[in-house]
From Swiss-Prot:
Subunit and partners: The RNAP catalytic core consists of 2 alpha, 1 beta, 1 beta' and 1 omega subunit. When a sigma factor is associated with the core the holoenzyme is formed, which can initiate transcription.
InterPro entries to which the protein is assigned, alphabetical: DNA-dir_RNA_pol_omega, Pol_omega/Rpo6/RPB6, RPB6/omega-like_sf
UniProt-listed Gene3D superfamilies: 3.90.940.10
Keywords for the protein's UniProt record, in alphabetical order: DNA-directed RNA polymerase, Nucleotidyltransferase, Transcription, Transferase
Reaction equation(s) it catalyzes: RNA(n) + a ribonucleoside 5'-triphosphate = RNA(n+1) + diphosphate
Organism, as annotated: Limosilactobacillus fermentum (strain NBRC 3956 / LMG 18251)
EC assignment: 2.7.7.6
Top-level taxonomic group: Bacteria
Disulfide bond annotation, renumbered to this chain: none
GO cellular component: DNA-directed RNA polymerase complex
Annotated protein name in UniProt: DNA-directed RNA polymerase subunit omega
Record gene name: rpoZ
Family the UniProt entry places it in: Belongs to the RNA polymerase subunit omega family.
Length: 94
């Protein structure tokens, strides 16, 4: 159960709960990948491989109330920084 941001505020940004879940999930995966790649780049002796952060989608807010990637994704959605691409959304519905 999420307490912040509220589901009602989040649903003002997307058209359905399903869209909200899909958008938050995809963004959370991007955040996780960015954090892992950033850690690997900072610790090349422990990571075992070199990692380039070019092309990764960095964190969009300066401060997050949540430490978990799903919560961070929801905060970005509430701020209007992460949205559904209407062209891609229409393709999925066909």
């Amino acid at each position: 159960m999420i307490l912040f941001p509220s589901v009602d505020k989040l649903l003002e940004r997307v058209d359905s709960r399903y869209s909200l879940i899909m958008l938050a999930s995809k963004r959370a995966h991007e955040i996780d990948k960015y954090r892992i790649d950033k850690w690997r780049a900072a610790h090349p002796d422990k990571a075992g491989e070199t990692v380039s952060l070019e092309g990764d989608k960095p964190l969009l807010l300066d401060h997050y109330d949540s430490n978990k990637s799903v919560g961070m994704a929801l905060e970005e959605i509430e701020a209007g920084l992460v949205t559904i691409d209407p062209d891609q959304h229409e393709d999925l519905q066909d």
